Amino acid sequence: MIIFQPGDLSEYTDLIAEESVSIRAVRRVYGELSGETIENLMPKDIYDIAEGTRTGNREAALKSFDELGEIAGAAIVSALHIVDGMVVIGGGVSGAAKYILPGMMREMRRSISTFSGRDFDCLQMEVCNLMEADDHKRFLENTSTWVQVPFTKREILYNHTKRIGVAISTLGASKAIALGAYAFALQQIDRKYKG
């Protein structure tokens, strides 16, 4: 299924996603929209402009983060068609999550359609922003029901609701890598001595 058509999100459809989902992308888009020179601007500066604590074009700053979220959302949607798992956003630009997540969630929740006009969600699963209380509660909601296993008298608990959670990492890259390496090492030790 093709869900990212040329021209849908960006005029740069022949470039890798990182050209629109990176520090340099935030700077480039801000410069294009504001008409200002960006040589001395870092994403933190553009974030401060979005916050209103630094002079500059606030609308351009907000749009630069929103576009990053939108393109990141499109890339994540493509990945979620083949990988079933949580979406955790980290790295330097995650500090601007409140400006990035709306575009990302909008893109991940968008509809696509057929030539006959039939609309459906671009993802099979419901997308929950775990940084928002209502979405977090909905993500954790138990909608399981008992179903009978065919050709047996057994019943099992089955959750028919497909959900995916989107969260922002608060660990930082170094700590996340260290914890992952530690968990992997423990797993390998368990395999060696229990297997």
Locate each region found by the language model.
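ATP-binding/phosphotransfer module of carbohydrate and carboxylate kinases, centering on a glycine-rich
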Residues: Q5-G195
